[in-house]
Amino acid sequence: MKNILSIQSHVVFGHAGNSAAEFPMRRMGVNVWPLNTVQFSNHTQYGHWTGCVMPASHLTDIVQGIADIDRLKDCDAVLSGYIGSPEQGSHILAAVAQVKQANPDAWYFCDPVMGHPEKGCIVAPGVAEFFCNEALPASDMIAPNLLELEQLSGERVENVEQAVQVARSLCARGPKVVLVKHLSRAGYHADCFEMLLVTADDAWHICRPLVDFGKRQPVGVGDLTSGLLLVNLLKGEPLDKALEHVTAAVYEVMLKTQEMGEYELQVVAAQETIVTPICQFTAVRL
């Protein structure tokens, strides 16, 4: 069984970061070692929260503890998401290096959460620069949304073709796989949710219907998406099939959340369809 060290945020109430991704990843049949970068009462889109950012040294201490019992060699991938400070980022990269020393075949999957003030996603100063300058070249896989893709590349992206080109430019700087996990205004269709999966040689596009939640969209969709893609790839799924499963599984969670009249992702209620989605979508090679 594969093992993932998941270094992300944690909320006590609701679903974001590890609280959104950990259970679905486990449900897909992998072990998850959750290491929390922050512990908040709830996610920041509520506009009010309590809790704390973990000291950067806490991350290193925990990873060293696993090394001390000689189990880092069993780690197949490190997944990082929301970080509370750029100092945490440096410690995460040190942890990645330590894992790869113990297991040279281990992957680093970076979800570069850079903040989106309009959506209430707030990150500390210096975090975006950390992702652009340090995490990108260290990653094997990276999963930006459109805004983050533009920040990582320093280029404006207006359409799918440009998104593919810019994603390939990121591949030249480090990662082998780039998931653009929300094309937004650069997509083909205004009424669809679209994603791209890009490598140096291939590009796959997929779309699904939007799920309308009104003015306030659920948080944690990107965390769920990244976690499920990593699981699929670790299990050896081809890129297109991995993208298809992730798209369908996340859509099922969104539908269940809407059906239940909830705002927080209903990952437990949707667990069966995360594993075996009812809806199906086809990835198209570009």
From Swiss-Prot:
Q: Which Pfam families match?
A: Phos_pyr_kin
Give the function comment from the record.
Pyridoxal kinase involved in the salvage pathway of pyridoxal 5'-phosphate (PLP). Catalyzes the phosphorylation of pyridoxal to PLP.
Decide whether keyword Membrane is in the record: no
Q: What is this protein called?
A: Pyridoxal kinase PdxY
* Protein's GO biological process: pyridoxal 5'-phosphate salvage
A Gene Ontology molecular function term for this protein is: pyridoxal kinase activity
- UniProt-annotated binding residues for ATP: D111, A143, E148, K181, R208, P209, L210, V211
Protein's gene: pdxY
Residues where substrate binds: S9, T44, Q45, D223
* GO CC entries: cytosol
Say which species the protein is native to: Yersinia pestis
Tell me its cofactors: Mg(2+)
